[in-house]
Structures are given as structure tokens and as C-alpha cells.
């Protein structure tokens, strides 16, 4: 309980950090930098991986990627402009079958398939929804990814709910999990219960401010006001994990309004 109370104090006293954090690994630390929404940069041993790069992020300090992973086909996951900016010639871009229709210069991994790209082992994990609603992700159209770096396994869930394929994951060291707000799927406690099924050492929440993300993609009109319930939902997630031995790292995934 003491660790949870300390976390609550930290959440209340400061804004979440978008600064890089590290994970010990063979051959040196893995450096993780949240960018925006579902977009994240991972570096290890000189290799740079970008997941769902999106042009609304500040790329001024983002190095060219050695590998790009795309989890879904909407613009906040698949952004050809961002890929072109951050991709050197010949750099592999791993996409879903649905994304291939919008981005022809990518390598498709279907759910459950594996491959090695830029020397990095990648496994595609099914990402889909089971609860009706909009948006809805049918099975087979989106991917999560397990990436192995320095003996560590990192899981990027992308989109979707806590499907059996996620619950069956083993040996995950770091997980990035979506919390879809205001869509009534993957609320904080269900996300926490999902995390408990496969027990990563560290978990990040991302992909949670859908209303603001939609505005970021269009810039039409004034930005929506801050969601007053976002800090409370993040605290609810942290509370649901209290005592589980899973480290929750809060991060700033969105630019200031």
C-alpha cells in the first residue's frame, strides 16, 4: 500500500514525464521515449525502432529509424508522411494487411506470424475488439507486436481488447497497453486485469485520449478541453495493480492543449 500511496502523490504533484526511461538489457540499456498517443521510440545498441510514428509528434530530436512497426491503418497509427521523414532507404516497415492497402512499401505480418527485421525478432499478436462499438477492430486487421531486444521482450498492444492471444503471452518485460477513452472498452480496471494475466515487469498506458487525438489529426476548431476524468482513470489503473509487483510508468503521451 505504501508504494501505491507514493505513486498517487507523484501523480498528483507533477505532470507525467515524456522524458526517456530505461530498461536494463544485455548489451546496454533499452531507452524508451513516448512520442504521442500510440507512438513510441525504442533504442538499444544503436538500433532505433519506431512504433506508429505520427506527424503530430515533435520529431526534432528523433533519429532516423532502423525499423518501423505499424499496428493499424488509421492515420494516427499509419502516417506515410511520418514514415517518409523518419525512414532511411531500405529500412523495413512492418504493417498489417489492412495497412498495406494504404502503404504499399511495407512488409505484411499477419496475426501470429514472426520475422526478423534489421536484426530484430518481431512477432505479430492479434489485436481486435470483442465488445460492439465504434471504432471496431475485427480480428485479423490489426497487430500488436512482441519485439525482442537485448534479451528483453517488449509488447506493443496497439489497439483492441484483452483477447486470448494477449492473455497467453509469456515472458513480457515491458508492455504498452491502450486505454480507450471515452470509448467504453478497455477502461482502467479491465486493462489492469488484462495486465495481470500475462504479468509484464513494467507497463505503460497509452492511446487513451481519443477525443484530443482526433483533434490533433485535424486541427479543426479549438482543441477539446482536458478530460477531467483522465487523472482519476490513471489512478484507478495504478490502484488496481497495487501489490502485484508490476511497475507502472506514467508518461505524457499528448502535447499540452
PLM feature spans:
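Structural recognition of the beta-strand scaffold that forms the well-ordered cores
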Residues: 34, 48-52, 69, 94-95, ...
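Core dinuclear metal-dependent hydrolase active-site scaffold
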Residues: 19-63, 108-170, 252-257
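Charged helix-capping and loop-helix junction motifs
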Residues: 138-141, 187-194, 223-231
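A short acidic, amphipathic alpha-helical/loop segment
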Residues: 81-86, 165-168, 189-194
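Bacterial N-terminal signal peptides
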Residues: 3-14
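Binuclear metal-ion centers of metallo-dependent hydrolases, dominated by the metallo-beta-lactamase
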Residues: 107-115, 201-257
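Active-site metal-binding motif and surrounding structural segment of the metallo-beta-lactamase
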Residues: 55-98, 170-176, 199
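Proline-aspartate-enriched helix->loop->beta-strand connector
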Residues: 172-176, 188-211
Amino acid at each position: 500500500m505504501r508504494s501505491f500511496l507514493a505513486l498517487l502523490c507523484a501523480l498528483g504533484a507533477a505532470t507525467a514525464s515524456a522524458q526517456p526511461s530505461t530498461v536494463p538489457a544485455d548489451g546496454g540499456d533499452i531507452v524508451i521515449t513516448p512520442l504521442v498517443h500510440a507512438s513510441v521510440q525504442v533504442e538499444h545498441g544503436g538500433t532505433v525502432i519506431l512504433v506508429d510514428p505520427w506527424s503530430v509528434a515533435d520529431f526534432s530530436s528523433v533519429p532516423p529509424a532502423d525499423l518501423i512497426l505499424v499496428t493499424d491503418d488509421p492515420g494516427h497509427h499509419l502516417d506515410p508522411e511520418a514514415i517518409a521523414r523518419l525512414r532511411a532507404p531500405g529500412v523495413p516497415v512492418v504493417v498489417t494487411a489492412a495497412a498495406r492497402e494504404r502503404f504499399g512499401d511495407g512488409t505484411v505480418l499477419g496475426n501470429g506470424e514472426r520475422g526478423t527485421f534489421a536484426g530484430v525478432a518481431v512477432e505479430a499478436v492479434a489485436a481486435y475488439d470483442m465488445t460492439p462499438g465504434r471504432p471496431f477492430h475485427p480480428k485479423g486487421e490489426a497487430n500488436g507486436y512482441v519485439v525482442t531486444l537485448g534479451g528483453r521482450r517488449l509488447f506493443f498492444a496497439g489497439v483492441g481488447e484483452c483477447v486470448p492471444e494477449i492473455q497467453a503471452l509469456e515472458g513480457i518485460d515491458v508492455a504498452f497497453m491502450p486505454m480507450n477513452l471515452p470509448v467504453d472498452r478497455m477502461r482502467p480496471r479491465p486493462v489492469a486485469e488484462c495486465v495481470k494475466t500475462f504479468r509484464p515487469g513494467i507497463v505503460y498506458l497509452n492511446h487513451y485520449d481519443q477525443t484530443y487525438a482526433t483533434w490533433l489529426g485535424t486541427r479543426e476548431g479549438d482543441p477539446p478541453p482536458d478530460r477531467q476524468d483522465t487523472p482519476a482513470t490513471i489512478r484507478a489503473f495504478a490502484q488496481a495493480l497495487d501489490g502485484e509487483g508490476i511497475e507502472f510508468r506514467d508518461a505524457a503521451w499528448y502535447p499540452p492543449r
